[in-house]
Regions:
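N-terminal secretory signal peptides
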Residues: 1-7
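N-terminal export signals
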Residues: 11-34
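Ser/Thr/Pro/Gly-rich low-complexity linker/stalk segments immediately outside membranes or between
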Residues: 35-45
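Extended, low-polarity segments enriched in aliphatic/aromatic residues
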Residues: 43-67, 267
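Extended, charge-enriched "interface" segments that sit outside catalytic cores
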Residues: 59-141
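A short, surface-exposed helix-loop junction/capping segment
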Residues: 146-157, 250-251
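Catalytic cores of enzyme domains
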Residues: 162, 173-174, 179-295
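TRNA-binding/sensing appendages of the translation machinery
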Residues: 164-169
Length: 295
């Protein structure tokens, strides 16, 4: 029987960043994973929640979906250009002139103070970690559509992959955790959950529309999601709580920026994975949270 390269459970857990057992304990049982099928059959592909967490079909807070409308992402304070509307143009201009800790104009001033946690090397660590959190600035491809480098089943002359929903969810969860995700979930896309998508991207202001098209599209003014898209895949990336607690110092920025950068890269990996299986996968075009409500 042909097998792919083997990997012990302990090694696989290390790759996922989940290995916390001692070497002695780890040697008690070391099953191996020969391929993705075996990973899918393992607990790695399961969504285990604490006993006090209960999954329900509807949110515990009642939502009047008939009244709910899609919101323009550019009108949130998560989007810097909207700051002026929240704090006033005069205050916004004053803050821009002095350069805050998070603005490039303030980097030099903060570093010159040479305070612990705000020194030059702290800033450098933060900037390095945050490099790819805005993929549209650096990627040669459109992040919404993905790299589109993986060969499709059609190009390979083979049928696209098809499986049962439960099998598919385990496969996607296993793949995403291997790529670096901490938790993975799926949400069905229907007339109600579509309202959670912004009408316009929070950062570049492109209109986000659903349309009867066969493939996703992107123009200079729009991002088009096919109506036949039925599922949203969501995932999280771990951050270090101790570093986050140091906000607004660079250590916190580095932790958050690294997670957002990793999130963009993980999304690209998922896009290529699903493309190779024969499916379209659209991702947020900019920093996580620019396409739909999140949190």
């Amino acid at each position: 029987m042909n097998r792919h390269s083997t990997m012990s459970r302990r090694t696989f857990m290390k790759v996922l960043g989940l290995s916390g057992a001692t070497a002695g304990a780890a040697t008690l049982a070391t099953p191996v994973f020969h391929d993705l099928d075996e990973v899918m059959a393992s607990p790695i592909a399961e969504r285990k929640l604490p006993f006090w967490v209960k999954e329900v079909d509807k949110p515990t807070v009642e939502i009047d979906w008939k009244r709910m409308q899609r919101f323009d992402g550019t009108q949130t304070v998560f989007n810097p250009p909207s700051f002026g509307k929240a704090i006033g143009k005069e205050e916004e201009e004053r803050l821009r002139k002095i350069g805050g800790l998070f603005g490039e104009a303030g980097y030099g001033r903060v570093v010159k103070e040479n305070k612990p946690g705000n020194r030059h090397r702290d800033l450098a660590m933060s900037l390095g970690a945050r490099f790819f959190q805005h993929p549209d600035r650096y990627a040669k491809w459109k992040p919404f559509l993905g790299p589109q480098q993986a060969p499709t089943p059609q190009q390979l002359g083979i049928p696209k992959y098809e499986g049962k929903p439960e099998e598919n969810s385990r496969m996607v969860r296993a793949a995403l955790k291997f790529y670096g995700a901490a938790t993975v979930g799926m949400v069905e896309l229907d007339e109600n959950t579509r309202k959670l998508f912004y009408s316009h991207d929070a950062f570049d202001k492109k209109q986000v529309i659903f349309s009867d098209v066969d493939e996703p599209q992107e123009t200079d003014t729009q991002r088009v999601i096919p109506n036949r898209a039925k599922w949203v895949i969501v995932f999280s990336v771990r951050m270090a709580p101790a570093n986050i607690a140091r906000a607004p110092y660079p250590a916190s920025q580095a932790t958050v920026g690294l997670a957002y950068s990793e999130g963009a890269i993980i999304a690209n990996r998922l896009q290529e994975f699903l493309r190779a299986l024969g499916y379209h996968c659209m991702a947020e075009s900019n920093i996580m949270g620019s396409l739909a409500n999140s949190g």
